[in-house]
Amino acid sequence: MKLKFYTIDARYTDYLREFDCKVPMEHTGQRHRPYIGIVLEIHQSLFFAPMSSPKKKHLNMHSLDIYKIQDGKLGIINFNNMIPVLDGCYHLLDIANEEEKYKFLLYNQSRDINRNHEKIGKIAKKLYSMYINNHLPEHIKSRCWGVSRVLCKSIQ
């Protein structure tokens, strides 16, 4: 299964944030950049797992709620910020339309993510299972998604 990059509608995340303050906001500032991530199916529900651009701190991070893309050199996937998604709330990212430097990063991230797609799926499913069964360490549970999964079911 090839993993692709998606963006998510800001209106949808704004709606979820009304009920769950842990739902991340889009990056704004000098250059508006929507959240980019992957979509995974976990127990018959779809989840959007956002990625984070490379930062020095990623190189030394060790936690079960992240996946380090190329050992953190290319960023991370933040499983702790996964949100449930519905069809129409997320859209395939056309990497070819991105700025050259950013396009290069996205292609490299895509290569690593697709080489390790099975591992990524296992991490997401394990974290989700630990969360719903109340087996996550408290310091990780406090970072993870909250009511947004319930809300997603209620708006379907």
Regions inferred by a protein language model and the residue ranges of each:
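GIY-YIG nuclease catalytic motif and its immediate N-terminal context
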Residues: M1-R31
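A broad, low-specificity signal marking well-ordered, structured residues that form hydrophobic/aromatic
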Residues: K4-Y6, L46, I77-I83
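Residues at the C-termini of beta-strands that transition into short coil/loop
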Residues: D9, S52, L86
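Residue-level detector of flexible, active-site-proximal loop/helix-junction positions
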Residues: Y12, K55, C89
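A short secondary-structure junction signal
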Residues: R17-F19, A49-P50, D94
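Compact nucleic-acid interaction/catalytic patches
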Residues: T28-Q30, E41-N78
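Short beta-strand-centered aromatic/proline hotspots
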Residues: Y35-V39
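C-terminal terminal-subdomain/extension
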Residues: Q70-Q156
